[in-house]
């Protein structure tokens, strides 16, 4: 995210979902489910279901609408070439995820396009009526997310 903001560019990766969430939601969901004696032995996917499971495209679209950012959508390899030789780039420590071919000449990140959606029935059922809700990623949540996770205050960054 920080690299995309610095470059004012987003790679064209389709339906890449990263399970974006908040610590508040995750901890509240885990604590609530763990207290239920019917939970042991069941699987709980805390990745959000449906439209709340934002793709990379959705996330940056929301940043543009909420804060006035403007991101160029560029082919993945062009985007990668913009930062791959800069060791100061936030993504540089995980360069291999973007560079090394894993299958069919594609790197790990490219392979995660068109990401599957996790089954969510147990989580939804166990959280029903609890008041524990996944984040909406509306403007106030996006602002907190940017400030707390990467130290960028959106009002200043978009200018």
PLM segments and residue spans:
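Short, contiguous acidic/charged loop-to-helix segments that flank catalytic cores in large enzymes
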Residues: 17, 50-51, 110-111, 132-134
């Amino acid at each position: 995210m920080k690299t995309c903001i610095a470059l004012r560019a987003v790679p064209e990766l389709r339906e890449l979902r990263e399970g974006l969430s908040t610590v508040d939601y995750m901890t509240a969901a885990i604590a609530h489910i763990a207290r239920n004696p019917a939970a042991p032995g069941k699987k709980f996917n805390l990745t959000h279901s449906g439209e709340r499971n934002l793709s990379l495209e959705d996330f940056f679209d929301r940043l543009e609408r909420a804060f006035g950012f403007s991101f160029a959508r560029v082919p993945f390899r062009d985007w990668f070439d913009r930062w791959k030789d800069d060791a100061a780039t936030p993504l540089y420590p995980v360069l291999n995820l973007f560079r090394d071919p894993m299958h069919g000449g594609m790197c790990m990140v490219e392979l995660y396009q068109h990401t599957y959606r996790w089954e969510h029935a147990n989580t939804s059922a166990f959280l029903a009526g609890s008041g524990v809700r996944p984040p909406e990623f509306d403007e106030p949540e996006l602002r907190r997310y940017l400030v707390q996770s990467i130290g960028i205050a959106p009002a200043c960054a978009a200018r």
